[in-house]
Curated annotation (Swiss-Prot):
GO cellular component: cytosol
Catalytic activity of the protein: tRNA(Glu) + L-glutamate + ATP = L-glutamyl-tRNA(Glu) + AMP + diphosphate
Alphabetical UniProt keywords: Aminoacyl-tRNA synthetase, ATP-binding, Cytoplasm, Ligase, Nucleotide-binding, Protein biosynthesis
Class of enzymatic activity (EC top level): ligase
Phylogenetic classification of the source organism: Bacteria, Bacillati, Mycoplasmatota, Mycoplasmoidales, Metamycoplasmataceae
InterPro entries cross-referenced by the UniProt entry: aa-tRNA-synth_I_cd-bd, aa-tRNA-synth_I_codon-bd_sub2, aa-tRNA-synth_I_CS, aa_tRNA-synth_I_cd-bd_sf, Glu-tRNA-ligase_bac/mito, Glu/Gln-tRNA-synth, Glu/Gln-tRNA-synth_Ib_cat-dom, GluQ/Sye
Keyword Glycosyltransferase appears in the UniProt entry: no
One Pfam family of this chain: tRNA-synt_1c
UniProt protein name: Glutamate--tRNA ligase
Short motif 'KMSKS' region, span: 250-254
Family according to the record: Belongs to the class-I aminoacyl-tRNA synthetase family. Glutamate--tRNA ligase type 1 subfamily.
The protein's Enzyme Commission number: 6.1.1.17
Length: 467
């Protein structure tokens, strides 16, 4: 049997951290077993779909390096890969379930359903159980009501059964059929519900293994019931633990203190391979506690048995550490491929070399680029206050001896050292006066590099009064 896994998002939003991790674990499992990873789109709820939701899912998966073997647009026997293109298939199978006695029409309106719930609550039943009244009506009454076209189709749950599976992450899990209400498989608008469509899609696409979030545990017994009703082989399920913030709370899209979507990290310029690496360690550990992996080594090392049963903490500091480590190991040429700087390639290379070790993401390069590309016209009050208290001798000597004709980093650096030796000063006493006079700030990269990057025209203008 060929291993086939899937990631099946709804285009109701952009690619979330949790969804990306789910996709990654399914991808790694499939590739570890030389299988296929499928991307399909669960777009049956038109009211919640958003513009570019599907596009965001696909583009950001590709940015992460999670490459589907099949996706919308693929021409295979397993398609189509959008639920909206399979409505006839769902309707046909729902009718089969009715004929076999596993499903039935229900004609309740919303008021009647609310009344049922209130009556059950009054009896101390707080988990709603549908009363199956429509199973008792005559065929004549049923046909009459079907003409009004206001109905749903419900799955008839076998109350005497236990629905069990050996979860790939959590072990044996069971639900009593008596605790599961007869649930809707086809809504009044003719569209399938999630729990029905997902089973049909997984069967049609021959999905063998499914890793997904723990919020789907309660959906699993319903889905198993559909598999059993059709006598289809049930795939193996594994339910991943939640991802938490620093306070131990589940990541929430409403939390504005942490970026929730992959697009945000992409736009910030995080290293995609670093994010891929970091994401894999959110709920999985290698046998030897190794942390740095490239794609191939991660696929080779991935073992689902090492998926955690405990919540995973999204540590932004660790992500920053990963991204910084990856960027620091890149070639300058590779970094330049990801940046749009000046027209001067010599300047660009020197700039990247200057900030490579300190940059966490590509946005950091741009932030520093702005400092040199749009330099300050004057020193601000805070810096001026600091500067006025310093000895100006280093500045005066530097201004009188700097060689503008031969603008060279090494010569600038040597001159600073010579001034230190002449005045017998080092550190802050030597560097701070020159830094403030030339860069208008009291911090930054190595001083000689900062001066060279600002350029001789700007430096000459700033030092003119100190000659």
């Amino acid at each position: 049997m060929k291993i086939r896994t899937r990631y099946a998002p709804s285009p109701t939003g952009f690619l979330h951290i949790g969804g990306a991790r789910t996709a990654l674990f399914n991808y790694l499992f499939a590739k570890h077993h030389n299988g296929d990873f499928i991307l399909r789109i669960e777009d049956s709820d038109n009211s919640r779909n958003i513009k570019d939701g599907e596009k965001s899912q696909i583009e950001n998966l590709l940015w992460l390096g999670i490459i589907p073997d099949e996706k919308p647009g693929s021409e295979t026997k397993f398609g189509p890969y959008r639920q909206s293109e399979k409505l006839e298939r769902y309707q046909k199978l729902a009718q089969e379930l009715i004929k076999k006695g596993f499903a039935y029409y229900a004609f309740d309106n919303q008021e009647e359903l609310e009344l049922q719930k209130k009556e059950q609550i009054a009896k101390g039943i707080f988990s709603f159980r549908y009363d199956q009244n429509w199973l008792k009506i005559s065929d004549q009454e049923k046909q009459k009501r079907l003409k009004n076209k206001h109905f749903v189709i419900r799955f008839k749950v076998d109350k005497a059964k236990n629905f069990c599976w050996n979860d790939l992450v959590r072990g044996q899990i069971c639900f009593e059929g008596s605790a599961i209400s007869d649930w809707v498989i086809i809504k009044s608008d003719g569209f399938p519900t999630y729990n029905f469509a997902v089973v049909v899609d997984d069967f049609d696409m021959e999905i063998s293994h499914i890793f997904r979030g723990e919020e789907h545990i309660s959906n699993t017994p319903k889905q198993i019931g559909i598999y059993q009703a059709f006598n289809w082989k049930t795939p193996k399920f594994g339910h991943l633990t939640i991802i938490t913030d620093k306070n131990g709370k589940k990541l929430s899209k409403r939390d504005k203190n942490l970026f929730q979507f992959i697009e945000d990290y992409k736009n910030q310029g995080y290293h995609s391979e670093a994010f891929f690496n970091f994401l894999a360690l959110l709920g999985w550990t290698s046998p030897d506690s190794q942390e740095f992996f490239d794609h191939k080594s991660l696929i080779k090392a991935f073992d689902y048995k090492r998926l955690s049963k405990a919540p995973s903490y999204f540590d932004i500091e660790k992500l920053n550490w990963f991204s910084k480590s990856y960027i620091s190991k890149m070639t300058v040429d590779k970094i330049l491929e990801n940046l749009e700087l000046s027209d001067n390639q010599i300047w660009n290379r020197f700039f990247v070399e200057t900030f490579q070790k300190s940059s966490i993401k590509y946005a950091d390069f741009y932030k520093n680029f702005e400092f040199f590309h749009r330099p300050k016209q004057e020193m601000d009050e805070k810096m001026l206050e600091i500067f006025e208290k310093l000895d100006k001798k280093p500045v005066k000597i530097f201004a009188s001896r700097i060689d503008y004709q031969n603008w060279d980093y090494t010569k600038i650096n040597d001159l600073i050292k010579e001034i230190g030796q002449k005045l017998e000063i080092t550190g802050k006493n030597l560097l701070l006066p020159i830094r403030l006079a030339t860069t208008f700030t009291n911090s930054g990269p190595e001083l000689a590099r900062a001066i060279w990057l600002l350029g001789k025209k700007i430096i000459e203008k700033r030092l003119l009064k100190w000659k």
